Amino acid sequence: MNLHEYQSKQLFADYGLPVSTGFACDTPEEVAAKAKEIGGDKWVVKAQVHAGGRGKAGGVKLVDTPEDAAAFAKKWLGKQLVTFQTDEHGQPVSKILVETCTDIAKELYLSAVLDRASRRVVFMASTEGGVDIETVAEETPEKILKAEIDPLVGAQPYQAREIAFKLGLEGKQVNQFAKIFVGLAKLFVDKDLALIEVNPLVITDTGDLHCLDAKINVDGSALYRHPDIKALDDPSQEDERERRAAEWDLNYVALEGNIGCMVNGAGLAMGTMDLVKLKGGAPANFLDVGGGATKERVTEAFKIILSDDQVKGVLVNIFGGIVRCDLIAEGIIGAVEEVGVTVPVVVRLEGNNAELGSQKLAESGMNIIAAQSFDDAAEQVVKAVGGAA
């Protein structure tokens, strides 16, 4: 689960990390009022969406008056912000963050991620702040410094000092960096995070370190332990179909093709998409209904898949282990009937009672094509939709 910048900065502040004074506002009038409350003669206003690249898209601006801040808010509130990280529709802007302007002498990069290879939290830092870290990793990987955190002892100040010296920090900056480093590590573990990113971590004109931006991703599997964090979720920033799927414990990811895929098992789902692509088709989604492929879940899965106007056909690929294929077939028939599916549906059943399941599909009298094999299923659905999207 992603957090907005203003939410991430509040968590930073709770852990004693240096962030700008700011307020998340809902109206242009509130933006102007909060700018006056903050004081000063310059402010930064930022559209709040779960996407990077806001600055280049016009979603971040330096303003000189509260009236200019209000005008920025009026321009963006209720609108869609399109960046290189969003789709063509962008993401809705419902809040504007107005905060103090910080004078920047130098930009650095600092982040922490859960590295599955080492099974530890790994910090990454670089002198190349304010830019896309993926670009830095690809073009100049030697500029990225790393430190693994031992889960038994936690982040140690000596690790922070070692990175600080390599970043060229000196004097009070070394201790400030150590405080930020240890604070972020504690926040990461305390809140079960998957990612923290400070880009940029800046050196101000007075020589102090300051977290100018903040990005946090929370491990969704741990949200039950953090109701306070779960309450920060903003459903408007999520794909509507993915949100509905999550409510039914369905794993759904929208793609750009025209063949809807419904499969039980993540590995089989990925293999299904690969084979569809190999046969000249284009998957419209990844959808894993899991082991409990009940009629209700299958029905909801059909609704989610068919809510995509690009879908011209559906491939259902089920391997029956504990779950009987004949019961799954009944669920598919009931779902197709209830949803009123009008596009071709190709079903491949394999495993427990597969023959009986295929027989029920054939006798249903509905527009359901029972495939003879995995390969046949992919060929049939690609043929049914007329080839690639």
UniProtKB/Swiss-Prot annotation:
Coiled-coil regions listed in the entry: none
One term under GO cellular component: succinate-CoA ligase complex
Biological process, per Gene Ontology: succinyl-CoA metabolic process; tricarboxylic acid cycle
UniProt cofactor(s): Mg(2+)
Pathway the protein takes part in: Carbohydrate metabolism; tricarboxylic acid cycle; succinate from succinyl-CoA (ligase route): step 1/1
EC number from the UniProt entry: 6.2.1.5
Domain of life of the organism encoding this protein: Bacteria
Binding positions (substrate): 264, 321-323
Free-text comment on the cofactor: Binds 1 Mg(2+) ion per subunit.
Transmembrane segments: none
Binding site for Mg(2+): 199, 213
InterPro entries, sorted: ATP-grasp (IPR011761), ATP-grasp_succ-CoA_synth-type (IPR013650), ATP_grasp_subdomain_1 (IPR013815), Succ-CoA_synthase_bsu_CS (IPR017866), SUCC_ACL_C (IPR005811), Succ_CoA_ligase-like_bsu (IPR005809), Succinyl-CoA_synth-like (IPR016102)
Catalyzed reaction equations: succinate + ATP + CoA = succinyl-CoA + ADP + phosphate; GTP + succinate + CoA = succinyl-CoA + GDP + phosphate
PROSITE patterns, alphabetized: ATP_GRASP, SUCCINYL_COA_LIG_3
SUPFAM superfamilies documented for this protein: Glutathione synthetase ATP-binding domain-like, Succinyl-CoA synthetase domains
A Pfam family annotated for this UniProt entry: Ligase_CoA
Binding residue positions for ATP: 46, 53-55, 99, 102, 107
Quaternary structure annotation from Swiss-Prot or TrEMBL: Heterotetramer of two alpha and two beta subunits.
Annotated function: Succinyl-CoA synthetase functions in the citric acid cycle (TCA), coupling the hydrolysis of succinyl-CoA to the synthesis of either ATP or GTP and thus represents the only step of substrate-level phosphorylation in the TCA. The beta subunit provides nucleotide specificity of the enzyme and binds the substrate succinate, while the binding sites for coenzyme A and phosphate are found in the alpha subunit.
Family as reported in the entry's similarity comment: Belongs to the succinate/malate CoA ligase beta subunit family.
HAMAP family tied to this protein: Succ_CoA_beta
Protein name: Succinate--CoA ligase [ADP-forming] subunit beta
Organism: Alcanivorax borkumensis (strain ATCC 700651 / DSM 11573 / NCIMB 13689 / SK2)
Record gene name: sucC
